[in-house]
């Protein structure tokens, strides 16, 4: 079946002052004062657009499908009082994902989207149009969506539009970065932040992870491994983290030669707590000044973001402690998470200085961000191109600086790349791409060429890395499960990596799936490198696909997950995503539609979710107990 002609309408909060409708090439842009900006763009065909009073006329000039599909994305912030309407039927955008992702489906003539302030954009369509209102969180995509199907025989049609401005304006966030909704632990006064300092010190001390282990006869070495297990299991002391197998169990071994299970926390230095305020500054009750101690709340390490991306979490640390320093904040949080049994930083830490200062193991990711990628294969470079290979080698020169660091566990190659697209994408490239020329010269089918491509890709990286750093581990690409479930990819990667990493989000562990990946990679150990559960109603932020009723239930879900991981015998670590809740108005690099979930162990006001921490502490005690 042919693809539908897709016209994308992207909705973003607060991008303009005064309603405006205009064209940008083949795009139609509706800019609303605070409700958003809608962009209509033909993606798989061409249309001629013309303006009329309160309307846009469409004429299809090139159709590559048998129907026209329009998709209107609505960002997650609309759970804060936003509403949808199709003709006379209407409803709220739900706070939590329901059993049915379809909020509406049926024929109609008119749709509307209304934000929390009452600003409303109404769009009218031809007779016979079919609509779906969809909750994309069903597929881990943090948006709502209008799907609009125009009858196939309609080649010319008119879309009408109207806009109703708000009467008054509500704020999306208070001065502490909190949404208007009530939730447990919400603060109303700066004095509460200052009072938290003493009470939280007492709470973290009460977790007493090391003391509880000691009462069980277990002592940790300086790296967090279980003292004495090296002698017990005959593990080697190499001065660096490495992997060994004894019997049917794989061990991550710390530099002192003891068994170590990687209990990591991702985004340790923050990042997802930043939000982009550009064009919607008036949606916030307060934004930090750019001078004085609050200047540290802005992302000042990158000039582009220095006046755009801000963290209310960091501003709250200024209120709470008097100042904010990136390294010192990370050192403080290392001491905290150690009390719950976490023993290392996960991916996206960006605070290796703090790790060294606190003697805390960490992982890193290769700096491949500036390397040219194949556009139709997300995150994957062309390994046949000599200049690209040279760029990869130059990027890996940076690993020499940490080659002798015993705290560094190893490197992730990248994150959630689309290797499954190789067979489709390479034949569609033009001959300017070296990979396309290599495919043509091979005379192989696209499916058969995938193995050649992957072998080249992994060989380039492994050879360059091992020559520069022989001491640390190659920890895989942080595959999504849909990517990992591929025999060819697993087999080739297994020849070059030390461990496989899977960003494995799941309510229940599919043991057959992870065992299949293990077998296909030739028996490589695994790190489940990204997962979390949310309790949206007991937090400042929204619910994730895997949402539970309470913070206590989050801790219980964590416990079930890590218990399953340890029981596999070949899983040597897990990484919870993230340390700090994502910004309620969307993490900065994704704009206003960015992820905004209850990911954190800490809220925007630096308050620990105490029931979660206690549950995690209890689960981590059991994990370490399996190593003795």
Task: Tell what function each PLM region has.
Residues 428-438, 577-628:
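Aromatic-rich peripheral "rim/lid" segments of glycoside hydrolase catalytic domains that contact
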Residues 395-451, 475-476, 571-578:
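Active-site groove signature of glycoside hydrolases
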Residues 448-463, 467-544, 559, 563:
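Glycoside hydrolase catalytic-domain groove-lining segments
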């Amino acid at each position: 079946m042919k693809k539908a002609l897709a016209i994308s309408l992207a909705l973003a909060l607060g991008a303009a002052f005064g309603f405006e409708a205009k064209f940008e090439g083949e795009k139609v842009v509706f800019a609303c004062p605070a409700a958003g900006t809608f962009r209509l763009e033909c993606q798989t065909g061409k249309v001629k657009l013309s303006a009329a009073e309160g309307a846009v006329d469409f004429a299809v000039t090139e159709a590559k499908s048998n129907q026209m599909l329009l998709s209107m994305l609505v960002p997650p912030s609309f759970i804060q009082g936003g509403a949808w309407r199709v003709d006379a039927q209407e409803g709220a955008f739900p706070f939590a994902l329901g059993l049915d992702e379809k909020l509406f489906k049926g024929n109609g003539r008119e749709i509307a989207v209304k934000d929390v302030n009452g600003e409303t954009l109404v769009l009218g369509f031809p007779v016979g149009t079919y609509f779906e209102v969809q909750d994309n969180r069903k597929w881990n995509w943090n948006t709502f969506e209008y799907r609009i199907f125009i009858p196939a025989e309609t080649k010319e049609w008119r879309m009408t539009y109207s806009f109703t401005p708000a009467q008054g304006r509500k704020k999306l966030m208070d001065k502490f970065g909190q949404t208007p909704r009530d939730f447990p632990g919400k603060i109303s006064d700066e004095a509460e932040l200052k009072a938290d300092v003493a009470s939280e010190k007492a709470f973290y001390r009460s977790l007493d992870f090391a003391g509880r282990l000691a009462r069980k006869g277990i002592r940790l070495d300086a790296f967090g491994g279980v003292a004495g297990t090296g002698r017990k299991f005959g593990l080697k002391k190499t001065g660096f983290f490495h992997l060994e197998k004894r019997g049917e169990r794989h061990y991550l071994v710390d530099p002192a030669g003891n068994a170590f299970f990687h209990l990591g926390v991702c985004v340790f230095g923050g990042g997802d707590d930043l939000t982009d305020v550009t064009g919607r500054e008036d949606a916030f009750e307060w934004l930090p000044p750019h001078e004085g101690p609050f200047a540290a709340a802005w992302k000042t390490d990158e000039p582009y973001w220095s006046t755009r991306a801000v963290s209310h979490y960091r501003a709250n640390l200024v209120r709470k402690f008097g100042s904010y320093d990136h390294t010192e904040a990370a050192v403080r949080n290392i001491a905290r998470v150690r009390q719950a049994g976490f023993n290392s930083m996960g991916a996206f830490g960006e605070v290796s200085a703090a790790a060294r200062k606190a003697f805390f193991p960490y992982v890193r990711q290769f700096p491949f961000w500036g390397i040219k990628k194949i556009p139709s294969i997300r995150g994957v470079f062309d390994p046949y191109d000599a200049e690209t290979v040279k760029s990869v080698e130059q990027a890996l020169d940076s690993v020499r600086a940490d080659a002798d660091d015993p705290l560094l566990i190893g490197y992730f190659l990248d994150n959630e790349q689309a290797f499954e697209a190789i067979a489709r994408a390479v034949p569609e490239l033009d001959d300017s791409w070296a990979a396309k020329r290599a495919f043509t010269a091979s005379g192989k089918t696209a499916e058969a060429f995938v193995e050649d491509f992957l072998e080249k890709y992994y060989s380039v990286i492994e050879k360059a890395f091992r020559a520069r750093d022989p001491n640390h581990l190659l920890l895989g690409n942080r595959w999504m499960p849909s990517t990992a479930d591929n025999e060819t990819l697993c087999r080739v990667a297994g020849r070059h990596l030390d461990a496989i990493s899977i960003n494995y989000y799941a309510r229940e562990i599919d043991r057959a799936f992870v065992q299949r990946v293990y077998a296909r990679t030739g028996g490589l150990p695994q790190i489940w490198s990204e997962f979390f559960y949310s309790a949206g109603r007991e937090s400042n932020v929204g619910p994730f696909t895997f949402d539970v009723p309470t913070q206590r239930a989050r801790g219980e879900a964590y416990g079930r997950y890590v218990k399953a991981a340890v029981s596999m015998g070949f899983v040597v670590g897990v990484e919870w995503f993230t340390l700090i809740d994502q910004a309620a108005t969307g993490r900065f690099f994704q704009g206003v539609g960015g992820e905004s979930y209850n990911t954190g162990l800490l809220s925007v006001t630096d308050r620990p979710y105490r029931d979660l921490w206690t549950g995690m502490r209890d689960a981590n005690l059991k994990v370490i107990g399996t190593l003795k």
